[in-house]
Amino acid sequence: LYETTNKYFSFTFNKVKHFADCRKIVYFQSSGRNVRIATTHGNLLCYDKLSKIIKELPPNLFVQLHKSYIVNISFIVEYSANEVVMSDGVHIPISYSRKEDVHNFLRLNY
């Protein structure tokens, strides 16, 4: 269902195939199997697990901060030990179990 070709993330929702430019995806937020894709042009919806989605995204552009969030590091405007702030003002927590990996990733890629 998911693929990234030429930096596009594709997914099927309600039997319709959608394409989202990875460079315009701000973050993914899951609630159960519902995943909201926040983009610079509004929100999209798909059904899946973040653990599957993260494998399909450009690895140097996206990082999973929490069991419920994957973020595009291009849209992080500030980060601290416990959270990041996205360009749209949303504060996203960094889980304790991912904290060290996230900070190492951000040091290398941000």
Label each residue range with its predicted role:
Residues 101-110:
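C-terminal output/interaction extensions
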